[in-house]
Amino acid sequence: MSLESVRAFLNAHAPDIEIIETAESSSTVALAAEAHGVEPAQIAKTICLRVGEQMMLVVAGGTARLDNRKFKDTFGAKARMLGAEEVVAITSHPVGGVCPFGLPSPLPIYCDISLKRFDEVVPAAGSTNSAVRIETGRLAELTGASWVDVCQ
């Protein structure tokens, strides 16, 4: 499903955004930055988390790290990263290709302010060798994300 679900989502909601597929893997921030000719911080990585029984996605700059204190202050509890099998189950995307587009079921999505220093960011597009270039504000708008400050 993954890449195709992202393609279907973009065709329906943002037909002007093109998926970029690369021959090489872009499954890590460093590989993605190299493949797309941007600095690592401009890669929009999607982190899959559980807070109690609630699952959520946080999209952050590629070099940003989740700050446990900020996260707890914002959400009232500590986050737990999901394992690879859980990630695929809730997003349909493999680790290294996770993005906030084309999800099988709605999830709360948050964009960290670490993305705001860029006009354009590069999130994955549902596979380990695909991505899109998207204006930062439009990423939040398309996914219905709320802005948070939970990274350092």
Please place each PLM-identified region on the residue numbering.
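Extended, low-hydrophobicity, polar/charged segments
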Residues: 1-152
